[in-house]
Amino acid sequence: MNIFRLLLATLLVSLCFLTAYSHLAEEKPKDDRSLRSNSSVNLLDFPSVSIVALNKKSKKISRKEAEKKRSSKKKASMKNVARPRPPPPNPCVATRNSCKSPAPACCDPCASCQCRFFRSACTCRVLSPSC
């Protein structure tokens, strides 16, 4: 029985080596002529690339356009910040204070009452910082 297992083990190992060897790539030595012919064919397959230098005017125009885009973004962000907020209600709860259901609303218009642990712990929290 031990001889039979030894024979099966050697057969299995030899099959593993045979499959690994069959999957290896074979490299054949190539002469210079075949390399030259392959390289010329490869160069002809690809389209040629032309490099064009930019003049100073085109660089200035692109910089001006970039500055205009930056300034328009700044103006848009300033418009969002400058909008008026509604006044807080008179009896209100400050941010990060308890705001259970009988308590009044949060003072910050961007804050809302968030409850955890089955509505046992409720606090006023600001959800979005961009508000």
UniProtKB/Swiss-Prot annotation:
Domain Agouti: 92-131
Stretch list, region Disordered: 57-104
Glycosylation sites: N38
Pfam families the UniProt entry points to: Agouti
Gene3D superfamilies per record: Agouti domain (4.10.760.10)
Role: Involved in the regulation of melanogenesis. The binding of ASP to MC1R precludes alpha-MSH initiated signaling and thus blocks production of cAMP, leading to a down-regulation of eumelanogenesis (brown/black pigment) and thus increasing synthesis of pheomelanin (yellow/red pigment).
Protein name: Agouti-signaling protein
Organism, as annotated: Vulpes vulpes
